[in-house]
Amino acid sequence: MGSSAITTSFLLFVAFQLPGQTGANPVYGSVSNADLMDFKNLLDRLEDKMPLEDEAVPSQVLSEQNEEAGAPLSPLSEVPPWDGGRSTQPREMGAPSDGDPGNPPRSVLLKSKLRALLTAPRSLRRSSCFGGRMDRIGAQSGLGCNSFRYRR
């Protein structure tokens, strides 16, 4: 009797699975072939309307578009180069410069702060609960927050 119940339940399981293979994925079952063809036609029309990246756009067309926008683009030669956040204006006599041994550059300070955050024992990147600690449940069993620790 036990083997017949197992056989019957297996046959019922297979019978329900075979006719509706798309039943497990309702997204694919709800999209018909006609809808897929409509999407394909729409995509083809959009690709036809969009210019290819390889085609060169004439400069006259670009200048007309700039005039329509109302603000012509400034040439790149007028833009000063980026100096890494340092001011090009001369410093005052009493102000320390970036090269003083007593004042390290700002980038060195930022790097040291980032390094300290990364090496901190309770770093937020290692916590699955945003730094919170579950004292009762997860501390000893590994079921709560911070159950997976990175090993070095």
Curated annotation (Swiss-Prot):
Keyword match Nucleotidyltransferase: no
GO molecular-function terms, A-Z: hormone activity; hormone receptor binding
InterPro entries linked to this entry: Natr_peptide (IPR000663), Natr_peptide_CS (IPR030480), Natriuretic_peptide (IPR050787), Natriuretic_peptide_atrial (IPR002407)
Disulfide bridges in this chain: C129-C145
Signal peptide region: 1-24
Record site: Cleavage: R122, S123, C129, F130
Post-translational changes noted in the entry: The precursor molecule is proteolytically cleaved by CORIN at Arg-122 to produce the atrial natriuretic peptide. Undergoes further proteolytic cleavage by unknown proteases to give rise to long-acting natriuretic peptide, vessel dilator and kaliuretic peptide. Additional processing gives rise to the auriculin and atriopeptin peptides. In the kidneys, alternative processing by an unknown protease results in the peptide urodilatin.
Family: Belongs to the natriuretic peptide family.
Protein name: Natriuretic peptides A
Organism: Ovis aries (Sheep)
